[in-house]
Amino acid sequence: MVKAVAVVRGDSNVKGTVIFEQESESAPTTITYDISGNDPNAKRGFHIHTFGDNTNGCTSAGPHFNPHGTTHGDRTAEVRHVGDLGNIETDAQGNAKGTVTDNLVKLIGPESVIGRTVVVHAGTDDLGKGGNEESLKTGNAGPRPACGVIGISQ
């Protein structure tokens, strides 16, 4: 079992943790998130970006992690970036908590996300269905108010 965590924060009120767990390279990865400080009753883009570099804030994390060179899509879509985790949904207080299981996100092997950055976006991810070029790259999810580098944990 490999475990990893990202402590998410930035130049906003958005903060929280994202925990990753994977049993083996062929097993799916469980992703558990607990994020606060978002707008209430909102959907916010949630992605793994390529770099673990946050020297200039979350913009230094680069584009979505996309080792297969595909277009952007929903977490459950057949064609998507590895880093496309869709949207998190907030409650009336702006908190988002949940767990998803993902077959593309890996902690083990050459496409590991360890050392990369999780980003919570300021807008809703259109899941690649926005009808423009940017939608196929970013889902038009907007600015990056909070992020955290994924690191190995106990």
Curated annotation (Swiss-Prot):
Residues holding substrate: 144
Q: Which InterPro entries match?
A: SOD-like_Cu/Zn_dom_sf, SOD_Cu/Zn_/chaperone, SOD_Cu/Zn_BS, SOD_Cu_Zn_dom
- How many cofactors are bound and how? Binds 1 copper ion per subunit. Binds 1 zinc ion per subunit.
Q: Which organism is it from?
A: Neurospora crassa (strain ATCC 24698 / 74-OR23-1A / CBS 708.71 / DSM 1257 / FGSC 987)
Note the subunit structure. Answer: Homodimer.
**What protein name does the entry list?**
Superoxide dismutase [Cu-Zn]
Top EC category: oxidoreductase
Cofactors: Cu cation; Zn(2+)
Pfam families, alphabetically?
Answer: Sod_Cu (PF00080)
Coarsely, its chief localization is cytoplasm
Quote a single Gene Ontology cellular component term.
mitochondrial intermembrane space
**Composition-biased stretches (Basic and acidic residues):** 125-136
Reaction equation(s) it catalyzes? 2 superoxide + 2 H(+) = H2O2 + O2
- List the GO molecular function terms: copper ion binding; oxidoreductase activity, acting on a sulfur group of donors, oxygen as acceptor; superoxide dismutase activity
Positions of region (Disordered): 125-144
